[in-house]
């Protein structure tokens, strides 16, 4: 794997060795310094978001890992992987730092990695280098005897936290009081809940229990079509931008997409506005993708004539409208790989992925739309020190038994309904011929399953360590 270290970039900026800026000087520090302090998402894009009370916290990492250098940690991880062999599989999300991702057996987006977890039924432990909701989904789709491990329990997701089960349940009760529960003449119920993959297992379970479904950024249009066949309206959470951008591309007028603010009666809308709604959007967003602006696109076009601007659908609608294309992380990766040499790309997604793509494709000019280095706060909480810690704990020694640290489990009362919502998503297929119509369905199958599904990128041990 090509190393394109954002960590190194941050260190060089912090010492003045190179020009540039970061969104927080604390990014130059190790994540365990935040684990012992005031609860929060950490430095980076979510540093201004308020973390819910009771969010998981990570205990102190042992000193031998905190004081180890990059090369020592790399060798310890390599040795532990060699000892454990097929008993363990490491999954790494596109947004992870390269110092972690170089050790991954599979690299992909959240759902591709959940599929990868299911593809290794013989592995005793699945180490998920991502964030909490991703590890939960891996636990839902893996075997009951497999342990899913999150190296740092503080690696949550501010967007996923913006919709909690109590607030969604209260919203649902208000909507049922307004709409009733009886289907119309076509058999469609008043409202169908749809949750983005970037949500807690509890919300996936809520959708499964109430006739709803899960979506990814690559199959959101297919899922909304599924929901509209069964419901008069959709309640979409937690990301307003993915819901709005997808519904708009399907022809839903903006005036039929009211926002639901859980702190206000009827979400801040009138009964008449909700009655006319097609898609009710939860008041949530991704702090990484919220940073991208139309002004950044304007600057990119002025400084790089002919630039191809691709952004993630979690970006605000004006940014998506101003871009040339939008698509999931896997769509962005494939679009760059398929482009003729000499292409120039301005990318609106997380900096670790953008910088890695630039290193992997020297034949192109690739840069992040946001000139400020500001990684995902919670992805950044995963560090090779934590990875080495949970790996080495799985190895029994002369004076210690093997130990599973930071295991993520979903309770069975939630898991049953959550799996139903996921299976509904797996069964939803895009209509024949739809993939050529607009950008998003082109790669709708990349995180879906079935005959056309694209697997995550599988790496080899020797290649990963390069």
Segment roles from a protein language model:
Residues 439-442, 454-457:
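Hydrophobic-composition signal
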Residues 2-347, 353-435, 463-466:
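Active-site loop-to-helix "anion-binding N-cap" substructures in soluble metabolic enzymes
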Residues 448-451:
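Intrinsic-disorder-associated, low-complexity terminal segments enriched in Asp/Asn/His/Tyr and depleted
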